[in-house]
Swiss-Prot record:
It is found in: Virion. This is RNA-directed RNA polymerase. Keywords: Covalent protein-RNA linkage, GTP-binding, Nucleotide-binding, Nucleotidyltransferase, Phosphoprotein, RNA-directed RNA polymerase, Transferase, Viral RNA replication, Virion. The gene is VP1. It catalyses: RNA(n) + a ribonucleoside 5'-triphosphate = RNA(n+1) + diphosphate. It comes from Avian infectious bursal disease virus (strain Chicken/Cuba/Soroa/1998) (IBDV). Gene3D superfamilies: 1.10.1740.80, 6.10.140.300, Infectious bursal virus vp1 polymerase domain. RNA-dependent RNA polymerase which is found both free and covalently attached to the genomic RNA. May also contain guanylyl and methyl transferase activities.
Length: 879
């Protein structure tokens, strides 16, 4: 293959096929194979230039807030609940915890890594070896058809026009400005309660579009949401003998960033600190609520003061998302991830994950449900969707997060919320938390949560992640909408899309390309755009049956010509047809597939990166995964991936590396591993393995707390409008609204109604006590008082979190960082005495030690003394 471009015949064939006309002295290879791309210099790679750009675009730069330096304390003293974990071999808890309790404070800094860059242009090189292999195979076909030529052309274009990497500061800044424009510009965000919705009416809609069940499983019920994180790990037995640990903490990616106050470290490295800070936050909140915090006077001030101490829980790191970006927009488009502080992520995940992870409910297993949550296109999943499209009834819709799919007038519409996270308000997230608590954390209508968690979910969590703040370089800046990537991102986006569909139903389902449909943007303050429309969708899908070509799933042979596809853009998947299985099967959208083939992401798992031979193992996994997700349908791509995977396998075998051991972790090495989660996939593509992967199986049984209205969203939307829809979750809803507030006195009426309903429940668990409930309109009228209280409390919480930031534009006065790319993380500098409430301070010491000179040591900051006194009073009250 080394001579692929050198022979006169090859030069002639390539020149003719791809329209290349080399001049004298030019090499065909030089013209066909893109050269190494050097990104343009980032014009905003300094704090002052970034701040100036943001100010010029009307973006708010906040006055910086400082953090206490971290100090070391013994883990067993801070987390006595988990002392037993330190005795277990391989325990994840370190002997000491590093906590933000120091006497000196600093301004936190975060310098993300942007690669490739002008200095390191080849950080993520394209797969030139794959391209050369495809060109070589192309030359072996005597009469190559247009389809084969298109494969080479598409891969070449992706290598030439795109690049994989994490963008630029300027790209991140442009994204921030664009998010602000969505939130405040053409259709500014609107709170749902001001539009006539209530938390309960939104919940009734989500009952259809995102039905959920209780946390845990039938044989292993979850513990109620009444504990601090450290008590979610339950030890049974003796660590010196037989023991068992019941883990009720949410699944968390321990390799991801820990966020403030641990810049540059992962959640796995700070798991003890994450639990300790979350523990203390919830315990302080609980204590203040028991004291009547939120009522007028000193108790209310204590709560707001406590929230100010934890300001950093609402400040995420502005992390650049690595993607395959267009080179032409390298300086203007970089997606941002709001990397949440790990305690914030943990506490919100404790609310959402136990419910959502055990709710595999979607269009495949519940009649009338339009949700694509936990949808997988394999094992017959995509075929079920195509059958749904082919059915004559319409209009109809599907929904997943910020994606909406509508079939109307035999036309398929793929609709995305425009910069979906930017459309979210704190009140939207309140409604989402209300839904998860009342529908998920509910046992036959009885709440499985306490006042502390209700208050956190309804009044505090939304303020932490929506319209909060973020850190980049030494700048603390405003965020508009929700921080992308927080633990409630999915459900918040899904709620926004549900409201769009609700309005569509109330309008009697107009065409998505009509002005009437477009008017929903203005009414809701939610922006969206039609990403793709396919007319005569049924005809095009039926044509796939007639045009299917021989291949792995149509004859059991390697393809010589690709079968046609219909690019539905269904969560990135297209449809093609298998004659052998007699069903429609998924292939990745062609553009996305060839873009993925053009640019490898490389080994992203740091723990695997250091293994000898891992690069060759990655090649095996990458090439076989590309075939599994759709490369099998494209002759040149399939054969090239197969050959390159085989070469990597032989290399590993010749060196004596344990191939089976590497491939056992293949899902960790593949960007597509999540698509095959739960499948026993043999990572060698054959007709048999593809047939097994796509063979239809019955969908998982649904897990819901109560039956879903089979009339679908349209029926519920209309019933809500008339007030005739019966509320079957009145008790838990009213209890939540009665407890999730900071001003207790204002919620007395709502609480009394909740207690009245609770007492009316008969002892017989099978009795239909819900028949005694009022119509929805009556119920919502009584809940309205508490709804207003919850909203008011959220505003107060937000003000407390922002109390130490400037209300005007701030011009940073820090020294220039000459080369941000080489700046270390974290940069701890600009030390100053602690003068105000900024951080946990000594609050955590109530569980362990105090300073040698006592809690009033003269070297302590005033705030540290205050927090230590608070802990001491709480400790004495428990004795």
């Amino acid at each position: 293959m080394s001579d692929v471009f050198n022979s006169p015949q090859a030069r002639s064939t390539i020149s003719a096929a791809f329209g290349i006309k080399p001049t004298a002295g030019q090499d065909v290879e030089e013209l066909l194979i893109p050269k190494v791309w050097v990104p343009p210099e980032d014009p905003l790679a300094s704090p002052s230039r970034l701040a100036k750009f943001l100010r010029e675009n009307g973006y708010k730069v906040l006055q910086p807030r400082s953090l206490p330096e971290n100090e070391e304390y013994e883990t067993d003293q801070i987390l006595p609940d988990l002392a037993w974990m330190r005795q277990i071999e391989g325990a994840v808890l370190k002997p000491t915890l590093s906590l933000p309790i120091g006497d000196q404070e600093y301004f936190p800094k975060y310098y993300p890594t942007h690669r490739p860059s002008k200095e390191k242009p080849n950080a993520y090189p394209p797969d030139i070896a794959l391209l050369k292999q495809m060109i070589y195979l192309f030359l072996q076909v005597p009469e190559a058809n247009e389809g084969l030529k298109d494969e080479v052309t598409l891969l070449t274009q992706n290598i030439r026009d795109k690049a994989y990497g994490s963008g630029t500061y300027m790209g991140q800044a442009n994204r921030l400005v664009a998010m602000k424009e969505v939130a405040t510009g053409r259709n500014p965000n609107k709170d749902p309660l001001k539009l006539g919705y209530t938390f309960e009416s939104i919940a009734q809609l989500l009952d259809i579009t995102l039905p959920v069940g209780p946390p845990g499983e039938d044989d292993k019920p979850w513990v109620p949401l009444t504990r601090v994180p450290s008590r979610m790990l339950v030890l049974t037995g003796d660590v010196d003998g037989d023991f068992e640990v019941e883990d009720y903490l949410p699944k968390i990616n321990l390799k991801s960033s820990s966020g403030l106050p641990y810049v540059g470290r992962t959640k796995g490295e700070t798991i003890g600190e994450m639990i300790a800070i979350s523990n203390q936050f919830l315990r302080e909140l609980s204590t203040l609520l028991k004291q009547g915090a939120g009522t007028k006077g000193s108790n209310k001030k204590k709560l707001l003061s406590m929230l100010s101490d934890y300001w950093y829980l609402s400040c995420g790191l502005l992390f650049p998302k690595a993607e395959r970006y267009d080179k032409s927009t390298w300086l203007t488009k970089t997606r941002n991830i709001w990397s949440a502080p790990s305690p914030t992520h943990l506490m919100i995940s404790m609310i959402t994950w136990p419910v959502m992870s055990n709710s595999p409910n979607n269009v495949l297993n519940i009649e009338g449900c339009p949700s694509l949550y936990k949808f997988n296109p394999f094992r017959g999943g995509l075929n079920r969707i195509v059958e749904w499209i082919l059915a004559p009834e319409e209009p109809k819709a599907l929904v997943y997060a910020d994606n909406i799919y509508i079939v109307h007038s035999n036309t398929w519409y793929s609709i995305d919320l425009e910069k979906g996270e930017a459309n979210c308000t704190r009140q939207h997230m309140q409604a989402a938390m209300y839904y998860i608590l009342t529908r998920g954390w509910s046992d036959n209508g009885d709440p499985m949560f306490n006042q502390t968690w209700a208050t956190f979910a309804m009044n505090i969590a939304p303020a932490l992640v929506v319209d909060s703040s973020c850190l980049i370089m030494n700048l603390q800046i405003k965020t508009y909408g929700q921080g992308s990537g927080n633990a409630a991102t999915f459900i918040n986006n899904h709620l926004l899309s549900t409201l769009v569909l609700d309005q569509w139903n109330l309008m009697r389902q107009p065409r998505p390309d009509s002005e009437e449909f477009k008017s929903i943007e203005d009414k809701l303050g939610i922006n969206f755009k039609i990403e793709r429309s396919i007319d005569d969708i049924r005809g095009k899908l039926r044509q796939l049956v007639l045009l299917a070509q021989p291949g792995y799933l149509s004859g059991g042979v390697e393809p010589e010509q690709s079968s046609p596809t219909v690019e539905l853009d269904l969560l990135g998947w297209s449809a093609t047809y298998s004659k052998d299985l007699g069903i429609y099967v998924p292939v990745l959208d062609k553009e996305r597939l060839f873009c993925s083939a053009a640019y490898p992401k490389g080994v992203e798992n740091k723990s695997l990166k250091s293994k000898v031979g891992i690069e060759q193992a990655y090649k095996v996994v990458r090439y076989e995964a590309l075939r599994l997700v759709g490369g099998w349908n494209y002759p040149l791509l399939n054969k090239a991936c197969k050959n390159n995977a085989g070469a990597a396998r032989r290399h590993l075998e010749a060196k004596g590396f344990p191939l089976d051991e590497f491939l056992a972790e293949w899902s960790e090495l593949s960007e597509f591993g999540e698509a095959f989660e739960g499948f026993n996939i043999k990572l060698t593509v054959t007709s048999e393995s593809l047939a097994e992967l796509n063979k239809p199986v019955p969908p998982k049984p649904p897990n819901v707390n109560r039956p879903v209205n089979t009339g679908g969203l349209k029926a519920v939307s209309n019933a809500l409008k008339t007030g005739r829809y019966r509320n079957e979750a009145g008790l838990s809803g009213l209890v939540l609204l009665a407890t999730a507030r900071s001003r207790l006195q204002d919620a007395v009426k709502a609480k009394a109604e909740a207690e009245k309903l609770h007492k009316s429940k008969p002892d017989d668990p099978d009795a239909d006590w819900f028949e005694r409930s009022e119509t929805l309109s009556d119920l919502l009228e009584k809940a309205d008082i508490a709804s207003k209280v919850a909203h008011s409390a959220l505003v107060e919480t937000s003000d407390a979190l922002e109390a130490v930031q400037s209300t005007s534009v701030y011009t940073p006065k820090y020294p220039e960082v000459k080369n941000p790319q080489t700046a270390s993380n974290p940069v701890v500098g600009l030390h100053l005495p602690a003068k105000r409430a900024t951080g946990v301070q000594a609050a955590l010491l109530g569980a362990g030690t105090s300073r040698p000179m006592g809690m009033e040591a003269p070297t302590r900051s005033k705030n540290a003394v205050k927090m230590a006194k608070r802990r001491q009073r709480q400790k004495e009250s428990r004795q």
